Amino acid sequence: MADEDDGLQLNICYLQRVPKKEINSKAEEEAYFKENISNNNNFTNNRAYREKTNKNENNLNNNKNNNNNNNNNKTYNNNNSNNSYNNNNYNNNSFNNNNNNNYNNNNSNNNNNSNNNNLNKKPTFLEKKIQQEQKQKELKELKGPQHHRYRNQENEESNAIESNSNNFKDKYKFAENKTKKDEFNRPILETIESNIKVEKSETFSSMNWGSLQLSETLVRNLVGHMKHEKPTHIQEASITPILKGNDALVKAQTGSGKTLSYLIPVVQKLTEQRVTRSDGCYCVIITPTRELSSQIYEELQKLLKPFYWIVPGIIMGGENRSAEKARIRKGINILVATPGRLLDHLQNTQSFPTDNIKWCILDEADKLLDLGFEKDVTTIINLLDSKKRTMKFKRQNILVSATLSEGISRLASLSLTSPVYIGLDSKVLEKGENPFQAAEKEMLQAPKQLDQFYVEVESKERLTSLIAFIRWKTSNITIDKGDVASGNSSANSKMIVFFSSCDSVDFHHYMFSNMKMDKERGVKRTKKEQIKQDKLIQQHKQKNSKIFQTGNESDDEESDNDDSDDSDSNNSDSETDEEKEIEKQIKEATSNPNYRVKTSVFSVPIFKLHGELDQQTRTKTFFDFKNSPNGILLTTDVSARGLDLPSVNWIVQYDPCSDTKDYIHRIGRTARLGNQGCSLLFLLPSEKKYIDHLAKFNVSVKEMKVTTILQSLFYTSDGQLKKTSKSSQLESQVHDLQLLFERFLIYDSKAKEMARCAYQSFLRSYATHKADVKSIFHISYLHLGHVSKSFALRETPTELNKMSAGIKGAKAAKKGDEDTLQKQTADFKMKNYKSVNEFSDGLNDQPLQRANFHYESASGVIHNIYQRHFNRNERDEADKNSNPKEIKEKKRRLYDKKIESNKKFKSK
């Protein structure tokens, strides 16, 4: 039985059992191989067995070469059985069931034979894959990357974990390990704001208002009512030359008081003579935006408070034209206007006298040219110059701007005659160099007390980073000596966030104001304390809003007693109702463990401002944000020029500006008149070279890590540490916040449509950067899938492009019928696309419409609507009805056309 068992051959799992036989020579070994191969025809087909035979043949060839070259090869065989061989010229093979470990030390002559034998061997799948990868690496080294996305970024970070943008988990883990923690194991957030104190001598002059040859009543108004104790440097330098009557070009940095520098001398000159309303307009102030014109008008009203006989006025687009015409007919002495509406009244309003105009002031002149008002401004100046002959005096023209350019030089050559340059470098003026060329070479000036930061963020993390930063800077997340601050940081916090398009402003404002989040529970606070505190905060906000609307904390004293009694009873009833509601909420919270209070995203009010809003809402939001103690303003570049918004702490540039000069104007909304301020610029990894571009203009920007911003997600809006199961993982906090906004878009169709419009407008605005920055902000650098993620969209870019065509058509077809409107919608456009989508299961509600077939019961013939059969009778009837003369004329025309085409061809 043992011999029969030894003769068994097993082909299962590529194993074979062979009889044990002693081999004493090479010839016996070869014969032994041949016998086993002939007996095992089925097994020879297996790849593993062929590889074993090839190895054995290679060993035999190597041994023959060793005998010819007299090379002594030692073999060390560790056999578990009693059979051992003392031959040093060949190796025992692996056909024995014992474990043999062969160590061959071959000479250099055997390398050629072994290489030849390896060529005959077929490589495995893994070997092929390794070879392909090596070839690809060699090709990449020889030939550089074709696309800019795969280029290596210059100035890589020293830390390899943070430089790898794809490895988010390692980045978050590294940030968690690196952050400092207090005694209670809470992450300590860095204090970014630096307490830079600017001396008054750097902003304000040492002179008094009386030394500038101003009237006493005007000085008392400036000091007492307007609370301006001393003039600024630009006001000191500009008031005296403007009072002399010279044309002036005023250049100064933002927030230095340029408005009063030309208003004060105009008012001083008008107070010297007795001015009446019937005299008409003496001064025209042209501004680029409506908000700036309303701000100047408000400042002018304060300045003219003691001089009641001087009448100010304002005209701008969006207002009632007939009401403006009536005000002009009554008489306006100082007029603030936008260029389009002013040109309209000059051309069409006959009751607009321009004979007495002594001053024409262009505020933010460079912005007037950038917005395309150059043609309107030139026509206005030409209309005013046409009446020079009838005027008894010379008109004084003043240009005011924070930056100078070639367009302003053209405008200055048109309007100014031998002007005085105020605010430029005195060395340049002494040399006689052109001030406009010197201004282009001049570096951009930012206030010293302004801290500038930038953060490098991936596209998919932009939305969560923005929300985390706003929550950080508008809430009470401050730690002092291991305790949470009581909450004075958000009481006076204001922030302006700049976007590149109006659609983006509308989308973010709608999402931030309408979305409700679960109330984040702190570590120490209970549900009862939470509900009570939330209710108290709401009551406090309602009281403040009532006071803000009415302007008085108490009612009028001359009210009836009955009314007061009724009001007291109503107040008591409302208080009892509120107490009952609080008790109900407490009962629900104690009974239901899953009870959660819904709150808004931010704890401060949110405002929006852009050019597509109507004029009433624009003025209302502007003054509401200006007068409110805290808030967030989402806006475009409309708010970047000239607006004086007090107590703004942070400027966030979510979308970088298209022009480098607009960067200075944006950050100039904070750190005004010596106050402290900060700015933050969001950049993609491909846009990091923009920092080097700003350094050419002497603008130094510090870096802020994304992880420092995202650390604020560990805290609630009240400044407490979140009590959640995932609070120790930063990645989970970011992921949950992103999912929250994506789910909001799924259930809100209006928000989804607004997000799609914002996505398309962002791409269009990204392609409008100027030539000097085009190489940095190029649209081909964007990852469109990640950009859609930043708008909380889950659709792919191809789907969004299909939908955008439907949205544009629906906007265009406003007066069409229902069928055309339905065809232009996004759902109709995506109907066929979704049914052929590679990710669909083929079971959609509206599959592709196949060809409709009509069945004729009489003949039983199937007619396809796309394959119409020819009917001779129809052709005959058509020929009968047609006129033979017309047919001949058509044939003759076709024949003439053919002849003419042949002639042209021959001539060519």
Swiss-Prot record:
Q: Which Pfam families match?
A: CTE_SPB4, DEAD, Helicase_C
Q: Which UniProt keywords apply?
A: ATP-binding, Helicase, Hydrolase, Isomerase, Nucleotide-binding, Nucleus, RNA-binding
Annotated protein name in UniProt: ATP-dependent DNA helicase DDX31
Q: Identify the GO cellular component terms for this protein.
A: nucleolus; nucleus
Q: Where is the Helicase ATP-binding domain?
A: 239-422
List the catalysed reactions: ATP + H2O = ADP + phosphate + H(+)
Q: Which CDD domains match?
A: DEADc_DDX31, SF2_C_DEAD
- Segment Disordered: which positions? 55-165, 519-590, 872-908
